[in-house]
């Protein structure tokens, strides 16, 4: 069944994914909770407590029960005594003034409270206040709630403070507010321990959005997990987009060199380069007869550790052996000297004219960018300084590039190392047999976005990783998705292709079984042939990894002859 045109997962809620006790976000959340509590208490005024909170306190309920029991005993004794002396009863009734309470429930409660306190002996009164002081010492949120209702409440636990507390409690027993539970949760969260916070936040599986709260604080982002142990935050490779054709490589170098030593690269710059993420792999000896610029040593961008790559260890030269003051032309030499092809490229980049290599490709066209470039910095600190100078808009980060002709706004897209891995749940173990390889992943896509896309499509996603290169730690365009359910894994492998829709990204990605470097054969378990398994049969009849002998053995039968293997590295 085709899984094209999937609707991307819409997020709700704002819980911490990881439950790792992120101090920055936890401190921020506590401030927000305090502000929310103050605003709710200003609107609620007197209806800000709940009987549910006070019913949890056994101490208060026991004291009230004892007081009611003692008051009932004293009332019965007085009735017995009055029945025995009728004359004194008349005098007592005439001497006592009737206490008139209004119809309001608050006034009745206040009157009954006055009667109880008058009947309470002095010794019981002191014990009552001492018990309340012990109770308040373990519940600091009571002070916060009581003072928010009564501005004249004292700072210490004196009798006036306890009386206000009792008055508030009795008032809320009759009139409870639905906002009370939320207020008490906010106040109690500030006093919760780190272990309780971790246990509560581990149950959260959904984030509110995919953009981190602050792009400049990548290490404090609460939606992502740092896979790197070191202090680095960004990749040393930065994407720069929105470049017009009039901007030259020299202009880019002159502007961004203020942040540190760097090189400029783009995919069409090195034809013989095997990996555009690491152009230094293409530094191979070349001949002048068949020249292809395969190394950025031949460009204007200087390599790391050299101020001028064309003037290193250069002896005295005659005017006839110099080429525009750059270096000596010697065929087949590369360690700081120019061969004919390098000299032609240097002239073309510096405005000496258009030259052709092998008479087929124009050097200027070959060395011109396609509207975007990659900045390869020597130090990660340079990327952080660059991000600090950028201004943020809805589309991302931008900076004004001052070239020789005009000032141009270009887009800066740094890669956060924290975006390379994402865990849905720490408590679920990762089964290496349920890991799928995702090919053709767009480089701007983060692991959290890829995880929620597959969670919405197939479900039961445990972990997602974006493959990065070893040198710059920049995405390679592929990823891995680990499932916890076998059926979800089988469905993903069976679909083979799926269209990924997210914002401006619309691309078809490939889903294949993931081959580990030491993948064992599931048929013989490596016991007989001692070989790794380079084949995987996606047919539901097999659906397992095979070494080469086991593949031929199991698929020699005519019923399995039509099975097509998925080969490692192909």
From Swiss-Prot:
It holds the Pfam family CEBP_ZZ. One of its GO terms (biological process) is negative regulation of cytoplasmic translation. The keyword RNA-binding applies. GO terms for cellular component: cytoplasm; nucleus. One of its GO terms (molecular function) is mRNA regulatory element binding translation repressor activity. Keywords: RNA-binding. Expressed specifically in the spermatogenic germ line. InterPro entries: CEBP_ZZ (IPR032296), CEBP_ZZ_sf (IPR038446), CPEB (IPR034819), Nucleotide-bd_a/b_plait_sf (IPR012677), RBD_domain_sf (IPR035979), RRM_dom (IPR000504). Residues 434-516 form the RRM domain. Cytoplasmic polyadenylation element binding protein that binds to and regulates the translation of specific mRNAs. Not required for oogenesis. This is Cytoplasmic polyadenylation element-binding protein 2. The gene is cpb-2.
């Amino acid at each position: 069944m085709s899984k094209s045109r999937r609707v991307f997962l819409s997020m709700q809620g704002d819980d911490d994914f990881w439950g790792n006790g992120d101090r920055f976000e936890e401190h921020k959340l506590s401030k927000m909770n305090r502000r929310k509590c103050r605003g709710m208490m200003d609107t609620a005024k007197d209806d800000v407590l709940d009987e549910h909170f006070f019913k949890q306190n056994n101490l208060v309920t026991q004291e009230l029960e004892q007081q009611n029991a003692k008051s009932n005993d004293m009332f019965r004794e007085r009735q017995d005594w009055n029945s025995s002396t009728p004359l004194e009863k008349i005098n007592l009734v005439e001497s006592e003034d009737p206490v008139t309470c209004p119809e309001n429930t608050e006034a009745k409660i206040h009157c009954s409270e006055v009667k109880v306190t008058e009947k309470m002996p002095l010794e019981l009164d002191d014990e009552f206040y001492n018990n309340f002081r012990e109770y308040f010492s373990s519940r600091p949120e009571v002070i916060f709630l009581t003072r928010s209702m009564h501005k004249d409440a004292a700072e210490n636990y004196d009798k006036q403070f306890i009386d206000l507390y009792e008055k508030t409690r009795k008032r809320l027993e009759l009139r409870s507010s639905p906002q009370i539970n939320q207020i008490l949760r906010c106040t109690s969260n500030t006093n919760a321990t780190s272990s309780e916070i971790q246990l509560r936040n581990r149950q959260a599986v959904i984030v509110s959005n995919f953009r981190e709260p602050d792009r400049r604080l990548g290490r404090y982002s609460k939606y992502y997990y740092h896979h790197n142990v070191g202090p680095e935050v960004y990749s040393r490779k930065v994407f720069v987009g929105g470049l017009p054709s009039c901007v030259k490589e020299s202009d880019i170098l002159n502007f961004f060199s203020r942040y540190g030593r760097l090189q400029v690269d783009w995919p069409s710059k090195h034809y013989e380069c095997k990996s555009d993420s690491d152009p230094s792999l293409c530094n191979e000896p070349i001949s002048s007869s068949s020249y292809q610029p395969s190394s950025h040593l031949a460009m204007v961008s200087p390599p790391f550790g050299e101020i001028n790559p064309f003037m290193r260890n250069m002896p005295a030269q005659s005017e006839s052996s110099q080429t525009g003051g750059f270096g000596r032309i010697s065929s087949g030499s590369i360690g700081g000297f120019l061969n004919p092809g390098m000299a032609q490229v240097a002239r073309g980049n510096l405005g000496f004219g258009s030259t052709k290599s092998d008479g087929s490709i124009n050097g200027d066209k070959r060395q011109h960018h396609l509207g975007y470039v990659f900045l390869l910095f020597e130090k990660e600190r340079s990327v952080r300084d660059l991000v600090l100078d950028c201004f943020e808009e809805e589309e991302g980060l931008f900076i004004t590039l001052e070239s020789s002709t005009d000032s141009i706004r270009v887009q800066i897209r740094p890669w956060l190392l924290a975006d390379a891995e994402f865990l849905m749940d720490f408590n679920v173990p990762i089964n290496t047999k349920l890991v799928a390889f995702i090919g053709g992943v767009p480089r701007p896509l983060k692991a959290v976005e890829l995880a929620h896309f597959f969670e919405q499509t197939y479900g039961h996603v445990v972990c997602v990783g974006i493959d990065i290169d070893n040198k710059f730690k920049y995405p390679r365009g592929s990823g891995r998705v680990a499932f916890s359910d076998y059926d979800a894994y089988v469905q993903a492998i069976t679909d083979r292709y799926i269209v990924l829709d997210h914002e401006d990204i619309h691309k078809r990605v490939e889903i294949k079984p993931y081959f580990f470097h030491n993948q064992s054969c599931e048929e013989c378990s490596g016991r007989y042939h001692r070989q790794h398994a380079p084949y995987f049969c996606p047919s539901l009849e097999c659906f397992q990894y095979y070494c080469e002998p086991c593949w031929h053995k199991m698929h020699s039968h005519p019923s399995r002859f039509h099975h097509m293997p998925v080969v490692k590295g192909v």
